[in-house]
A protein has these predicted regions:
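Substrate-binding/catalytic lobe of Class I Rossmann-like enzymes that use SAM or dcSAM, i.e.
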Residues: 134-182
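A short glycine-rich, Lys/Arg-flanked "PGG" loop and its adjoining helix->strand segment in the class I
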Residues: 112-124
């Protein structure tokens, strides 16, 4: 997300958010779900830009508490909500679903369940966006440090490892983008 005129990490992060918001093509009044909301950066930015109802989910009590407090502080608590819940237990249907930086934690043996869950939650003609750190070669040796300290139980997948479980759910890949330099 380092465009030619990007000078700081904050600018690069904003470029990433703007890029994702553009791809999501959120319309006023739509219901949006972020799977793995972290500290709320994406949700708060989307809420500032779009008139939609956004739910963020996480398994971290600290993240949810922080996000709820930050939403009140920003005056966005009527537009956004945060739930401490596993993606497999979420109810409802959404026009847009996105996940940024969470899929690495899912683990290969749960890919089918993950994409089935996204398909179940997505309204007809809805859009799901997945942003993940990946590897170029699915046969490459996993990085022991990353597997132990960064994504324990998870992995950085290759595109080929992601596409098969997506296709099995009936989701359709309409766009795939590799952003090598960021």
């Amino acid at each position: 997300y380092w465009k030619e005129d990007t000078k700081t990490l904050e600018e690069a992060q904003q470029n990433k958010i703007d890029h994702i918001v553009k791809k999501l093509n959120i319309k006023d009044g739509q219901k949006v779900l972020e799977v793995g909301c972290g500290w709320g950066g994406m949700i708060f930015e989307i809420a500032k830009q779009k008139k939609c109802e956004i739910t963020g989910i996480s398994l971290s009590k600290n993240q949810i508490k922080y996000c709820q407090e930050k939403a009140k502080e920003l005056g966005l608590d009527n537009q956004v909500k945060f739930d401490l819940i596993d993606y497999r237990k979420v109810k409802g249907r959404y026009d847009r679903i996105y996940s940024v930086g969470m899929f690495e934690h899912v683990g290969k043996k749960f890919y089918n369940i993950f994409f089935k869950s996204m398909n179940r939650l997505l309204k007809d003609n809805g859009l799901f966006l997945l942003h993940t750190i990946g590897v170029v070669d699915s046969l490459s040796t996993p990085n022991k440090f990353i597997n132990k300290y960064i994504f324990p139980g998870g992995t950085c997948p290759s595109f080929s490892q992601i596409i098969s479980p997506i296709e099995k759910t009936g989701l359709i890949v309409s766009d795939a983008e590799t952003l090598i330099r960021h």
